[in-house]
Regions:
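Catalytic cores of alpha/beta
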Residues: 18-22, 72-83, 134-146, 184, ...
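Active-site pocket-lining/capping segments in soluble small-molecule metabolic enzymes
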Residues: 103, 183, 202-243
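Histidine/lysine/aspartate-rich catalytic loop segments that bind and position anionic ligands
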Residues: 125-162
Length: 257
């Protein structure tokens, strides 16, 4: 049980207008908007952001990540991040989801400060760069100093169930220090949320709630992968509003008990 009755937060990670609309229909509280979720998400284009804004009324935090892979950024990559923060601020995003590390696995405080300065009044989430940092408890404190309001994390494991011990520790640290909100992500399902509500004080959850859909193409030239040979080019991933609604129902019921 929780000491303070903090409102629950259900954030849905989406990479299409269709998914954004499904998330809203299911009762998500907020969107994390990205492109190419199939590689863990990279920065979305402005066109996608504007269409999502037009078709969907939910608050939007934009994931900013210039490429697949680690969070050690070259000068040019960092310049892209800085420009994207400015662009999405001008376009009216509610927040950005960012993270930069140094070679030794510490949080790159200078780069983070610069991006946060550029963000102005937008809210800041520290993304799963946190899950590959060297000293999570220290980075949690630093995130608080930077004014970051949310940390998206799996507890430094392949999924948040495996990472629950660290997530519990971080949640306790938050109750002592009033630092950033801990948002559990990676492998979140309605059942996982139920387990977390029984065993932790965590109130924020991040999921893609995705279903696989068959491509509408009747004509199919197989054996011509566009990138990742392990993935079918004729499978489409989309948020399922029913899964979002089930997650929301579990949170709502727990909130009224």
């Amino acid at each position: 049980g929780r000491g303070r009755m903090e409102p629950y937060m259900l954030e849905c990670c989406v990479d299409s207008v269709e998914s954004a609309m499904e998330a809203e229909k299911g009762g998500a509280d907020r969107l994390e908007l990205c492109a190419a979720l199939v590689i863990g998400g990279i920065s979305p284009g402005l066109a996608l952001f504007e269409e999502v804004r037009k078709c969907c009324g939910l608050p939007v935090r934009v994931l900013l990540r210039p490429r697949f892979g680690d969070f050690l950024y070259t000068e040019h990559e960092f310049e892209l991040l800085r420009k994207e923060v400015a662009l999405f601020r001008e376009k009216g995003a509610d927040g950005v989801v960012i993270g930069c590390l140094k070679k030794d696995g510490s949080l790159h405080m200078e780069q983070m400060r610069e991006l946060i300065r550029e963000a102005g009044s937008m809210k800041i989430t520290l993304h799963r760069a946190f899950d590959v940092c060297a000293e999570p408890m220290r980075v949690y404190g630093q995130a608080g100093e930077l004014g970051i309001d949310t940390i998206l994390t799996s507890g430094q494991r392949e999924n948040c169930l495996a990472g629950m011990p660290l997530l519990k520790e971080l949640s306790k640290l938050r109750q002592r220090t009033g630092g950033p909100q801990i948002m559990a992500g990676a492998g979140v399902t309605p059942d996982v949320i139920r387990t977390f509500l029984e065993e932790t004080d965590i109130t924020a959850y991040h999921l893609s709630a995705k279903k696989t859909m068959d491509s509408g193409m009747r004509y199919r030239r197989e054996g011509v992968p566009m990138g990742l040979p392990s993935l079918s080019e004729y499978t489409i991933y989309r948020t399922d509003s029913r899964v979002v609604a089930e997650a929301k129902r579990i949170l709502t019921e727990n909130g009224t008990r």
